[in-house]
Amino acid sequence: MSSEESNPKQADLEIAYTRLSPSQNPGDKESSYPTIIFLHGGESCHLEFSRVTPFLTDDYEILLVDLPGHSRSKSIPFSFDNAVNALSHLIKTQVKGGKVHIVGLSLGGFVGLQFARRCSELVLSLWCTGCAPFSGYRHWLRSQSRLLSGIIFVAGRLATERIFWASLGVDPIPGLRAEVKNNQTITLLKPVFDELVSVTLENFAEIQGVRIAIIAGGKQDNVEDTVEAGKVLRSKNPECNAFVVRKAIHWWSLQLPEVFAQGVRAWVEGSEMPKVYEPLLTAVS
């Protein structure tokens, strides 16, 4: 059962965030740039976008949040309800115009999709990756939430800094590994997995009026599930699309930050996606 069905809603939850603003012209009293909120993956924090944002900060107001249960927002239990309500409060109180573009990776993508479903009036567009509803063994594995949480907890304690970064094939980002390790608790992981397995394509069919790009990292994400998710999204809005970046791993904000940022910029601006983003839907899908 999802949190939406089982927990009473809370209002005005305040999640931690970092604001990155373009340089202001002398005399400007407040930013007139579009706002993008970045939502990180499970176990992680806002630092995972450290290599992406330098390609965007000249042209956008950027808010990098720590999702409930994670890092600076650890005091707020993770649930989709809490994440949606905290994001809604953040947008209404901290964003000029009260509407944003959202970028989400993995868990952050699932949160972004839930937010678009429940608060579409606050969303200008959504760009999300690694967040198609799970099927087959991927769904079964995450449904074993206590067991999987325990395995990740133990593995996180055993993995050295060198092993952690070598497994991703990327250069270290200062501070990120420590945050991931601190977030790898059963208290956080179990509710994350319980929420993830509650997500269905029927949920996606309830999203109205939001232009969404859903993307698969070709090396690790399930491309077929991404196609099916894209079809459902497009059935509700012909401007939605699905893509695969063939060389991307799941956590590719670390691996291909410039390509990641190029796709975000294109989607936000409504321009043609870079060629490395291979469309997965036909014109009539």
Predicted feature descriptions by range:
Residues 117-118, 122-154:
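Flexible "cap/lid" loop of the alpha/beta hydrolase fold
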Residues 191-235, 244:
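Conserved serine/cysteine hydrolase catalytic core
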Residues 248-261:
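Catalytic histidine-centered segment of alpha/beta-hydrolase-like enzymes
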Residues 242-248:
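Short glycine-rich catalytic loops that host catalytic nucleophiles or stabilize transition states
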Residues 137-139, 154-210:
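Conserved alpha/beta-hydrolase catalytic His-Asp/Glu region
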Residues 13-74:
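Conserved HGGG/HGGXW glycine-rich cap/lid loop of the alpha/beta-hydrolase fold
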Residues 104-108, 112:
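Gly/Ala-rich beta-loop-alpha elbow adjacent to hydrolase catalytic centers
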Residues 23-25, 51, 63-103:
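Active-site loop/oxyanion-hole signature of alpha/beta-hydrolase fold enzymes
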